[in-house]
């Protein structure tokens, strides 16, 4: 924000004292060179130089120094010229601190997003695996032989009330994360140890299963079959078949993955088209392609659908984060300026132009404040990165530094108004109007009303009669980005007058008109200060035209590498820009052209493509999970966590700090999107086989039987004597879902009181925070209290009765005087038995192909000599040599 210098009266007294001091200094220092005198007068007093990065302009502490310290200051002037110049340079550097601190962590997160296709698949996708389980005789003794069953590979249940449903939702999420974009069976095939002729099976897990079965007590026919297992190659068709041991559901998954691979043939035409068109057609870049691509080359087309969530619309926090990340990335690829004018030489020249040896007005010393090459480079990068990422900027300046304001006139000319936060833009424009424009024509100060829909420049345009000045104001007022769709991407493009630099001539005409005015209401010193500031800038007309052209060219070249629509919306936070750094850029820009290297462009393009593709894939995942949650009746419960997971997987967001209202708005946007067909098919596969998956789990039961009186335990071939029921014959059945939906528990109560066991049918975990009893806890407590009291409500796990603590192999059957009982039985269906021949499937894929993720690695690129680089109008970018 602009602000005026406080303590003005006090400063005028100080200035008179300082002028007297300067006269004394000039008498004492006759031996020093004129340059030394000049530098000392301009830069020795800290209180004379006001830096833009201060929030308040305070009177320097040096004013308060004692007479002793002032005499020390006089002694310092007598140092040698060389030492003194070093001090001056150091002091200048101290006065402007670059505003930007690179957040390397964000940049690393962006660059670390790699295409998922790069992950090499080493195993098939599996939910099931065969396991050996013991067999118990009728008397409870364990047999020596085992039986194989299909069990879940990862048998885990999440915490919560609807555990089983959440299990299936988590399973689906796991499938989505592991769903491969392509499968090349040759890469994962391993040797079958039991093969006669060194044959191979599809993956290491199949080999391990074959090995375990071969060593088990299996019939000779099965061993012979394993010995025959090997791959079958059809070289003429580039096809290979591998034997695999898979559960039928796993086979359906992998067969689906094989038939819906995303790989496409890769050739030079695609690589050529993959390079952004504007870079292909840019004569400054020389591109060559390696034409030796093998016929087996493949690639995975990146998913570059445009932003379906419209994050710029009502997602302020998310939009701020994404633009910040883009800003940091863009700054990292904007080239550094080269061969800037020597800071010291330029300050000396400016001092001569200002004739500061005949110093009569204090404000002119501020013209030289903070001019250094670091600030110039910082400003250059900030402007381009902000335009590329559409980050809003705010301006820091001091109203009394006329040079800053005149530089600000160039800035407002070449950068569209929308790029600045309105309060900052209004303050800067008001300072320019009241400090330079209105005083030149003798007009009264503009009293701007806060909240006025018009900006100060728009008001001034209507009041100023001078054609050139009004014409320039009109250009600035209507300077906006043009929205152009290039290669399907919305670009924010600068006005053609800015791109070719002609607008700088328009600015100079306005400045010349202002410098010729009489400033009738102002002192002569004031008029001269403004004129000298304009003179300093107008001396650099050629360099400013070149700078404007260079700024536009680099902005457009890097913009070609952006793949997401450039939406222009004001951001929550802003990038600070000091007008003294703009002065540094204007005064120090040389004639050396800098253009981004091809490697930088390709890197920027790849990072943008990878982020954009990952963004779309994560949207597809989130939409699929929302649909699955809806179908599993988990919609309300899981929704916020689904959206949080979506944001976490984008890597750049701090999810904990995103406001809830934006989370729910994001949920609503995701809910409206269609599900991608592959993800929908995968969910349907899971939904159709939920019962098989439940049966294979050791933690999921298909129901529970509860009774008023104890029921005798039954012998089970897999577990011995346990409270597990394998069928529901003879029990009254009630569906758990219906029970929870209706809330009518009278039927259960009546049956239990009549000593009729009730079977509640539905998937539930053995151990759960919300047991089946708590699901029916709304019963009349007086009737049901005794039933609840007689059982462990939170543990439904089967009870295993052992003979003694030393043996895990035998179960209690011999004590005929005591019959083990339980008031609760778990209804658990028998898992599917493992049948070797029924589980052997042949999978088919290409014999070989190579997937390339970095397509630009095939392109060798170089640039013309920077001095010969041309802009869009086929003229050299930098003409002022």
Swiss-Prot record:
Subcellular location: Virion
Biased composition (Basic and acidic residues): 9-27
Pfam families membership: Rota_VP2 (PF05087)
GO molecular function: RNA binding
Quaternary structure, from the entry: Homodecamer; each decamer is made up of two conformers of VP2, called VP2A and VP2B. Interacts with a VP1-VP3 complex. Interacts with the intermediate capsid protein VP6. Interacts with NSP5. Interacts (via N-terminus) with NSP2.
Summary of the function given for this chain in its UniProt record: Inner capsid protein that self-assembles to form an icosahedral capsid with a T=2 symmetry, which consists of 120 copies of VP2, with channels at each of its five-fold vertices. This capsid constitutes the innermost concentric layer of the viral mature particle. It encapsidates the polymerase VP1, the capping enzyme VP3 and the genomic dsRNA, thereby defining the core.
Free-text note regarding domains: The N-terminus binds RNA. It is necessary for encapsidation of VP1 and VP3. The N-termini of 10 VP2 molecules form a cylindrical hub underneath each 5-fold axis of the inner capsid.
Protein name in the entry: Inner capsid protein VP2
Organism (species): Rotavirus A (strain RVA/SA11-Both/G3P5B[2])
């Amino acid at each position: 924000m602009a602000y005026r210098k406080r303590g003005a009266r006090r400063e005028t007294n100080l200035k008179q004292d300082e002028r007297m001091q300067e006269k004394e200094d000039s008498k004492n220092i006759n031996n020093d060179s004129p340059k030394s005198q000049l530098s000392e007068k301009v830069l020795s007093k800290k209180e004379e130089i006001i830096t833009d990065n201060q929030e308040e302009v305070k009177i320097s502490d040096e004013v308060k120094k004692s007479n002793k310290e002032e005499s020390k200051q006089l002694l310092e002037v007598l140092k040698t010229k060389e030492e003194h110049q070093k001090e001056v340079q150091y002091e200048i550097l101290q006065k402007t601190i670059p505003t930007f601190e690179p957040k390397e962590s964000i940049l690393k997160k962006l660059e670390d997003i790699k295409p998922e296709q790069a992950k090499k698949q080493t195993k098939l996708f599996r939910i099931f695996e065969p396991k050996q389980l013991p067999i118990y005789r009728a008397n409870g003794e364990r047999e020596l032989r085992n039986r194989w069953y299909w069990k879940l590979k990862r048998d885990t249940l999440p915490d919560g009330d609807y555990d089983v449903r959440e299990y299936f939702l988590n399973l689906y999420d796991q499938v989505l994360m592991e769903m491969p974009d392509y499968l090349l069976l040759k890469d994962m095939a391993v040797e079958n140890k039991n093969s006669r002729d060194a044959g191979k099976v599809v993956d290491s897990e199949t080999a391990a299963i074959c090995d375990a079965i071969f060593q088990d007590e299996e019939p000779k026919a099965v061993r012979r079959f394993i010995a025959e297992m090997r791959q079958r190659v059809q070289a003429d068709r580039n096809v290979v078949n591998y034997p695999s041991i898979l559960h039928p559901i796993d086979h359906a998954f992998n067969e689906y993955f094989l038939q819906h691979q995303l790989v496409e043939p890769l050739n030079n035409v695609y690589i050529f088209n993959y390079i952004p068109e504007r870079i292909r057609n840019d004569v400054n870049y020389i591109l060559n392609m390696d034409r030796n691509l093998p016929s087996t080359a493949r690639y995975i087309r990146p998913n570059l659908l445009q932003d379906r969530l419209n994050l710029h619309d009502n997602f302020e926090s998310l939009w701020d984060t994404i633009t910040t990340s883009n800003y940091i990335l863009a700054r990292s690829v904007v080239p550094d300026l080269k061969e800037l004018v020597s800071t010291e030489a330029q300050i000396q020249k400016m001092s001569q132009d200002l004739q500061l040896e005949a110093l009569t007005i204090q404000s002119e010393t501020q013209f030289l404040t903070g001019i250094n090459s670091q600030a110039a480079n910082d400003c250059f990068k900030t402007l381009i990165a902000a335009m590329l990422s559409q980050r809003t900027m705010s301006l820091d300046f001091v109203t009394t530094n006329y040079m800053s304001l005149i530089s600000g006139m160039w800035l407002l000319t070449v950068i569209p108004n929308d790029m600045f936060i309105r309060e900052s833009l209004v303050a800067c424009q008001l300072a320019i109007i009241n400090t330079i424009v209105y005083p030149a024509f003798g007009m009264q100060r503009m009293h701007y009303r806060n909240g006025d829909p018009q900006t100060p420049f728009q008001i001034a345009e209507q009041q100023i009669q001078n054609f050139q000045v009004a014409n320039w104001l009109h250009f600035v007022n209507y300077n906006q980005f043009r929205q152009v769709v290039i290669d399907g991407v919305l670009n924010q493009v600068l006005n053609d007058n800015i791109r070719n630099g002609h607008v700088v001539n328009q600015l100079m005409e306005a400045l010349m008109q202002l410098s010729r005015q009489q400033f009738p209401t102002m002192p002569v010193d004031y008029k001269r200060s403004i004129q000298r500031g304009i003179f300093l800038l107008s001396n650099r007309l050629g360099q400013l035209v070149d700078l404007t052209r260079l700024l536009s060219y680099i902005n457009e070249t890097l913009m070609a590498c952006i793949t997401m629509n450039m939406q222009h919306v004001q951001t929550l936070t802003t990038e600070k820009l000091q007008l003294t750094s703009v002065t540094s850029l204007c005064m120090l820009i040389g004639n050396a052209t800098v253009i981004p290297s091809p490697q930088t462009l390709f890197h920027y393009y790849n990072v943008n493509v990878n982020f954009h593709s990952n963004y779309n894939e994560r949207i597809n995942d989130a939409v699929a999970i929302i649909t699955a949650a809806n179908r599993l009746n988990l919609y309300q419960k899981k929704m916020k966590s689904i959206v949080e997971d979506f944001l976490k997987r984008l890597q750049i967001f701090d999810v904990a700090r995103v406001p809830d209202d934006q989370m729910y708005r994001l949920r609503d946007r995701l809910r409206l999107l269609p599900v991608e067909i592959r993800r929908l098919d995968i969910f349907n596969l899971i939904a159709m086989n939920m019962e098989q998956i439940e049966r294979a789990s050791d933690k999921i039961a298909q129901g529970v039987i509860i009774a008023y009186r104890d029921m005798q335990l039954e012998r089970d071939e897999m577990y011995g004597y346990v409270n597990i029921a394998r069928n529901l014959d003879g029990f009254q059945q009630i569906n758990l879902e219906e029970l929870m939906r209706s809330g009518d528990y009278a039927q259960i109560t009546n049956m239990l009181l009549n000593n009729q066991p009730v079977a509640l049918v539905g998937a539930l975990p053995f151990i759960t925070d919300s047991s089946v009893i708590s699901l029916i806890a709304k019963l009349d407590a007086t009737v049901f209290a005794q039933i609840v009291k007689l059982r462990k409500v939170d543990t439904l796990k089967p009870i295993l009765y052992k003979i003694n603590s030393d043996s895990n192999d035998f179960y209690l059957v011999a004590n005929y005087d005591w019959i083990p009982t339980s008031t609760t039985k778990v209804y658990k269906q028998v898992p599917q038995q493992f049948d070797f021949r029924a589980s052997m499937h042949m999978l088919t894929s290409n014999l070989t192909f190579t997937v390339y993720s970095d397509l630009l690695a095939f392109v060798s690129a170089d640039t013309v000599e920077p001095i010969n680089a041309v802009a869009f109008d086929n003229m050299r970018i930098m003409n002022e040599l």
